[in-house]
Swiss-Prot record:
Keyword Transcription appears in the UniProt entry: yes
Record-stated family: Belongs to the ArgR family.
InterPro entries with a match to the protein in the record: Arg_repress, Arg_repress_C, Arg_repress_C_sf, Arg_repress_DNA-bd, WH-like_DNA-bd_sf, WH_DNA-bd_sf
UniProt keywords, alphabetically: Amino-acid biosynthesis, Arginine biosynthesis, Cytoplasm, DNA-binding, Repressor, Transcription, Transcription regulation
Gene Ontology annotations for the cellular component aspect, listed alphabetically: cytoplasm
Lineage of the species this protein comes from: Bacteria, Pseudomonadati, Chlorobiota, Chlorobiia, Chlorobiales
Molecular function, one GO term: arginine binding
Subcellular location as annotated: Cytoplasm
GO BP terms, alphabetized: L-arginine biosynthetic process; protein complex oligomerization; regulation of arginine biosynthetic process
Protein name listed in UniProt: Arginine repressor
Keyword Transcription: yes
Pathway terms, separated by semicolons: Amino-acid biosynthesis; L-arginine biosynthesis [regulation]
Its job: Regulates arginine biosynthesis genes.
Amino acid sequence: MNKALRQKKIRELVENNDVSGQQELLGMLEKEGFSVAQPTLSRDFAEMGIVRNRTADGGYRLSVPEEPQEDILRGLVGMEVLSITANETSIIINTLPGRAHGVGSFLDRINSPEILGTIAGDDTVLVIPATIRKISSVKSYIQKILSQP
């Protein structure tokens, strides 16, 4: 099952229904044709920032943070990047010490079809593009989303 599609459905269900918890959401997902294990749903909640809030009547309701939070996160991640360089096969992002994992994770969560994945060390992220023919455009895309010159 496609993670992005699953998370899109989770967002839709949580935003459009009064969902009180994970078990209720698991049932709703099942009715929509998504077979999801509880640990997977927990990871999705963490990645998406879904929280459980108390309602006025004393119950609980799941909620998804607004999208502008993504813009704030993008700005913060961008401040951790020192440089972005590329050769004919890969892209390297140099970060502040200890920040490479966060930058790599941010890029992975974007789910861009142009990026196969990232490998992060302490202060360096290796970006693996979907094709080496588009290295320049992938580098430009990363610079744009991280607001780098």
